[in-house]
Each structure stands twice: as structure tokens, then as C-alpha cells.
């Protein structure tokens, strides 16, 4: 086991323990997009199940969105060799996105909503206890700033949440993992990564701008990323302007 994998194991098991993400006997589906993050999470979590750290029934779900150039042959081989239960489901969400999004606009928002809808539907149909997503620490940091700058809300990606209908529980075991470690791990493991030819081809996305902003700030103060992350668990309601929060503090 490489140093990088040991590091990933440490932070993933810490998040699972700290936020009580998994329970014994869980039937859990890991959403494998074909990118470095979900591949890294799968490899580490599969190893933790193999060595009996976790007693869960793991199923891998991949959504083929019918994008041009999609080739999952190497992904299938990887999953077969790993020996995990999996399903690659084909849905033409690409056609919907191309039809609905005006030329010049970014696809990410609609594409992610359609993908999320299919994930939730599949989880319900197969009675999954948990939906496992591969978002990492940097995703949380960027999402917080994006919510503030572009939506006027203070929110990000929680380690665990239940959907509004109460049907699905979503968990993110990599909330403490840095993207740079996942990049290194992907190089070490040579994962058969499938690039996104839809949103990946679009420049000047908001997330890229926010990522660059954080990187620039970190050059002046390396603690900026960790400070942003820590702010998500160090909330001072009395110092905010939410009337409902302030009223609840007074009552």
C-alpha cells in the first residue's frame, strides 16, 4: 500500500467515524462517474471492506449519459477485475441538455440535476440505504464560496444529508481529502478515467474561477483553504443576519 493510499484511508475512515456515515449491514451504492475522485474512493473503500473495516454491501453505479465519445470498456474491465457488483445504466440526458440549454450557456447545472435525479431514482428502486458520492475537501470549499458569491446563501456539501422526500441518504466520505492526493493516487493506480466531453470542454466556468481565486489567496496565506473548510463547522449564528436564527436564539 502506497503512502498516498494510507493517507486517503486515514481521512476517509476519520470522516466516516466523525459523521457516522456508515452502519453495519448498509446496502450502499457508490456513484462512479469515471473520474479520478470516484475511482479513488472506490479503490480505498473496497480495500476497507476487504480487510473487514466495514461490513457493508457495496454496489457501484455508473450513469452513461450518452455523451459523444463515451467508452466504458476499460471501466467495465476494471470493475470486473476488482470483483465488485456494478451496473452501468444508459440514459440520454446528453440529448436533453443539448436541447434545453441555449447556445453559449454552460451545461453543468441541468446536467447535474438530471444525473442526480437518475441516481435518486435508481437508489429508491434498489432499496439502497446510502448513496456514496466522491466529493472532496476542495469541492466543499469551492461550493461554499460559489453559494455566497453567486446565490447569496451560506451552504456547501454536507458529509451526510437526507433528501427532502426522506427517501435517500447521501454521504460524502472524502470531505477531509485534498484533491492533490487524489490526483497523485490516480497516477499511482493508473485508473481508466473517462473524461467529460460535455462540461469539460467549456471554459470560464464559475467553479474554475472560484478555484483560481482560492489558489491565489493560498499563495499569500496557505491556511486559507483549511480556514474556509473549518468555517463550515465553526458557525456563529449570533453574528449572522438570518432573522429566523436570531429569533430562535432569543426564544
Swiss-Prot record:
Per the record, its GO cellular-component terms are:
cytoplasm
Native species: Francisella tularensis subsp. holarctica (strain LVS)
PANTHER family this protein is in? AMINOTRAN_5 DOMAIN-CONTAINING PROTEIN (PTHR43686:SF1), SULFURTRANSFERASE-RELATED (PTHR43686)
Keyword match tRNA processing? yes
What keywords tag this UniProt record? 4Fe-4S, ATP-binding, Cytoplasm, Iron, Iron-sulfur, Magnesium, Metal-binding, Nucleotide-binding, RNA-binding, Transferase, tRNA processing, tRNA-binding
Q: Which cofactor does it need?
A: Mg(2+); [4Fe-4S] cluster
EC identifiers of the protein: 2.8.1.-
Binding positions for [4Fe-4S] cluster per the UniProt entry: 108, 111, 199
Q: Which Gene3D superfamilies match?
A: HUPs
Chain ranges for the short sequence motif PP-loop motif as given in the UniProt record: 33-38
**Quaternary assembly:** Homodimer.
Principal location listed in the UniProt entry: cytoplasm
Which enzyme class, named as a word? transferase
Task: List other remarks.
Answer: The thiolation reaction likely consists of two steps: a first activation step by ATP to form an adenylated intermediate of the target base of tRNA, and a second nucleophilic substitution step of the sulfur (S) atom supplied by the hydrosulfide attached to the Fe-S cluster.
**Intracellular or extracellular location(s):** Cytoplasm
Its domain of life? Answer: Bacteria
- Cofactor-binding details, from the entry: Binds 1 [4Fe-4S] cluster per subunit. The cluster is chelated by three Cys residues, the fourth Fe has a free coordination site that may bind a sulfur atom transferred from the persulfide of IscS.
The task this protein performs is described as: Catalyzes the ATP-dependent 2-thiolation of cytidine in position 32 of tRNA, to form 2-thiocytidine (s(2)C32). The sulfur atoms are provided by the cysteine/cysteine desulfurase (IscS) system.
GO biological processes: tRNA thio-modification
| Reaction catalyzed | cytidine(32) in tRNA + S-sulfanyl-L-cysteinyl-[cysteine desulfurase] + AH2 + ATP = 2-thiocytidine(32) in tRNA + L-cysteinyl-[cysteine desulfurase] + A + AMP + diphosphate + H(+)
Name it: tRNA-cytidine(32) 2-sulfurtransferase 1
